[in-house]
Design a protein with these regions (language model features):
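The feature marks the mature, well-folded catalytic cores of soluble enzymes
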Residues: 1-368
Length: 368
């Protein structure tokens, strides 16, 4: 029997992974879910259309280099099949001027045990993105008799799924933070919504960020679907744009997490970690004062690292402070040039999704 799919956490030895591509990537036109994500003064405002061939080529050079680096370490690498993202898409409820891309598979696919699950996604522009990964998932399904290929309920993403005029230009940053603290986000509870990158896998326990891209119904659905697991919903009030957990809260090995110091986990949500002797420490400061041009993400992609095993971590090579911190914590740091790929969907964790890690499901939080 050929075993292809197995991954229970973020740190066991990685043996097989999907690395994204930048081909055909677009900046989609405005839609209800994306407007609140773009910070004031960002060069992303009012910009949409295909990304330049020059920027795509630079990103692909770094993605290809990353893939070769992983392969040299004995890790099998698969790549998605890009679509023509620069085309209009539609459902019976809406139409959108273009799609996004397939650089960040972590957003779309979550692997848990022998299952690979397609997330609902919360952007209209990303509704069809799962198609880029279907050929790979189908091949795993055909080879591995125990692999489960699943898809969460596709959302309609009508206007009822979003708060109207959320975070208008008249709202100050303090007011934005107050709304986030109250857990008032752009997405409503109209239907089940979650992005896979809002989920951290820690054996029997899954930690899910409630924010712009995952709602409480999404967390509830995950708990019902993964019925042998425990779901914990987290939120980080210091983040005015809470999208995806992996530039905020990053486990490096059992018992150790780095936390974005500008988005600290609230004290009342720390209990489960403290009861089980987990240490949450502030991540190092980013090496850059600004993200690259036309980048959705913040400078905190510095902590968006890929753990290869409990002793080895890939870090973007220019993020010297994060490299130094992780080295001082006792890890081998593998520096990876990746900043040209940031604008296409994130850093090293975003750009990958697990297929196979050694290990089995363990209970890292026995004291609930």
């Amino acid at each position: 029997m050929t075993k292809i799919v197995n991954s229970w956490n973020e740190w066991d030895p990685l043996k097989h992974v999907i690395v994204g591509r930048a081909d055909n990537c677009c900046i989609p036109p405005a839609e209800p879910a994306t407007d609140p994500k773009i910070p004031e003064g960002s060069d992303m405002q009012d910009v949409h259309g295909p990304r330049s061939e020059e920027s795509i080529d630079k990103a692909n050079i770094q993605l290809d280099n990353f893939s070769r680096l992983l392969e040299k370490r004995g890790i099998k690498v698969d790549r998605p099949t890009p679509l023509d993202f620069n085309q209009k898409i539609a459902t019976p409820d809406w139409e959108n001027g273009s799609m996004f891309g397939c650089m960040p598979p972590r957003d779309v696919i979550i692997t848990l045990g022998n299952e690979m699950l397609e997330a609902t996604m919360s952007y209209r522009s990303r509704w069809f993105e799962y198609l880029c990964y279907r050929p790979l998932l189908e091949s795993y399904f055909n080879i591995d008799p125990e692999m489960k290929m699943e898809s969460a309920p596709k959302p309609r993403l009508t206007n009822e799924s979003y708060r109207e005029n959320y975070l208008s230009e008249d709202i100050s940053i303090d007011e934005r933070l107050e709304m986030v603290a109250k857990k008032e986000f752009v997405t409503t509870e109209r239907e089940i919504l979650f992005d896979a990158a809002d989920i951290l896998r820690m054996g029997k326990d899954l930690f899910v960020q409630h924010g712009f891209t995952t709602n409480l119904k999404g967390s509830d659905w995950l708990g019902r679907h993964f019925e042998n697991h425990r779901i914990h919903t987290l939120n980080f009030p210091g983040d005015p744009y809470p999208i995806h957990i992996d530039a905020t809260f990053t486990p490096l090995k059992p018992g150790l997490i780095i936390n974005n110091p500008t988005r600290p986990l609230p004290n009342e949500q720390r209990d489960i970690f403290e009861r089980n002797d987990w240490h949450i420490i502030d991540a190092a400061q980013p090496a850059h004062n600004e993200p690259p041009p036309l980048c959705y993400s913040s400078i905190w992609l510095s902590m968006n690292v890929l753990v290869l095993d409990p002793k080895t971590v890939c870090v973007e090579e220019s993020e010297v402070y994060q490299c130094e911190q992780i080295s001082d914590l006792g890890f081998e740091v593998v520096p990876v040039p990746f900043r040209d790929a940031y604008p296409f969907g994130g850093a090293l964790h975003c750009a990958t999704t697990d297929v196979y890690r050694e290990g089995k499901m363990e209970d890292y939080f026995p004291i609930q």
